[in-house]
Amino acid sequence: MGVISGYAGGITINPTYERVSAGDTGHAEVVKVIYDSALLSYEDLLTVFFAMHDATTLNKQGNDVGTQYRSIILYTSDAQKATAEAFIVKLDNDVATGKIVTELKPLKEFYDAEDYHQDYYENNKSVPYCEIVINPKLAALKEKFNSLVG
């Protein structure tokens, strides 16, 4: 199990952080999740995904604004697509959730982000962004999903 930071969902071949940040590649900043489906279900991943970010505001996460920050699910199978569609319908039917704006599309190509983006939190725990943004998210993740993240 693990994650790889990267870019996907756009049109530019071999995008860089600078190009993606400029908003002209069509790519979103994404994370490839590598997991064992015998230990963690795709629905579990969707539960965590929707609980840990704002899927109701278009092109914005926290103070980060732009299409590269859009909520997006890039599926790799028809089964993943169907599961994600059903999950989104269930959330849309929950009045308290708000309208889900998450983009759902097939993964065509995933591009690894630059090395300095990989394991960013582990390598930069004392950076203000990690202390102010990531630490509270990790605490919430552990509190809400301790059985999944251990």
Q: Predicted segment positions?
A:
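Flexible coil/turn and secondary-structure edge motifs
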Residues: 1-150
